[in-house]
Amino acid sequence: MSERKKRGSSDADSRRGVAIISPPKRRSQRKSASDSPIPAPIMKRSITVKKIMPRKTLAAIANTGSQFTPKVSNVTAAPRRSSRISPKIQKENAFSEQSQMDPKDVTSQSSAPEIDVLSPIPVNIQLSPKLDNRDMIMSQKVRRSYSRLEMSLNSSAFLYSPTRKTDSSDTSTPNAVLKSSRISLFGFDKLLNSEMPEGELKKSSAVTREKTANERNLQTVLPEEPDHNIPGVVLAKQKRRKRKVPVLEKSDVDEWAAIMNAEFDEAEKFDLTVE
């Protein structure tokens, strides 16, 4: 009983104000960071976006004669619009959207100041010369399409048979003929069937063959000379050494001729007997 009373008295003393030593508490980095000095605020700089005016608008302004003074102003960059999305003018419900707008909004939009745009192109632009009446007519004409012609060339439309009388192979119109026939020559096949006689044709063909044969022989014998007239290229001259041909004396040639003649005479005198 005495021990319990002592414990109770010690608990009461601690409650009354007796200081009890406790280990120091660790402080988190998050709380300690708040005690550090506050950094200086970051200075934000304003960015000016410059938009270049297209040449078409400048040319239109020059035509009207209005004095245009380009000024620099802060312009926000407009987001680029993809070519897939059509503008509101081409939509069917564009008229209804415009009709739903209040007149107050329209007046506020019209009263908004126009933004001046910086452009490096001068205002005084020389306009292109005016087109003549003939040029205007030619520009308005539709360009001819050759898609059908290409398709018919790839297909069997330009095939013809020589036995067919109603064939119009020399024109550009396709002919519905079988695939087994040969391709038309657009009228140049008449040049193949010339009116020259057969004798003259044979002579001309023989002459041309001889010419081609002679040209081939010359090409094989004579090597092709490089072209020295190339701008910016310096070709080094090739030094060709001449082959030294051994000179034979006349006495040596006569001796060899005598030896060969003697061998031939012996061969002629030899009698070959076959059993």
From Swiss-Prot:
Its main location: nucleus. Regulator of sister chromatid cohesion in mitosis stabilizing cohesin complex association with chromatin. May antagonize the action of wapl which stimulates cohesin dissociation from chromatin. Cohesion ensures that chromosome partitioning is accurate in both meiotic and mitotic cells and plays an important role in DNA repair. Required for efficient DNA double-stranded break repair. InterPro entries: Sororin. GO terms for cellular component: chromatin; cytoplasm; nucleus. The KEN box is required for the association with the APC/C complex. This is Sororin-B. It holds the Pfam family Sororin_middle. A motif (KEN box) lies at residues 91-93. Residues 253-275 are annotated as: C-terminal Sororin domain. Disulfide bonds: none annotated. Residues 63-76, 93-112 have a biased composition (Polar residues). Residues 1-42, 63-117 are annotated as: Disordered. The gene is cdca5-b. Keywords: Cell cycle, Cell division, Chromosome, Cytoplasm, Mitosis, Nucleus, Ubl conjugation. Interacts with the APC/C complex. Interacts with the chromatin-bound cohesin complex; the interaction is indirect, occurs after DNA replication and requires acetylation of the cohesin component smc3. Interacts (via the FGF motif) with pds5a and pds5b; the interaction is direct and prevents the interaction of pds5a with wapl. Coiled coil: none annotated. It is found in: Nucleus; Chromosome; Cytoplasm. Ubiquitinated by the APC/C complex in G1, leading to its degradation. The keyword Cell cycle applies.
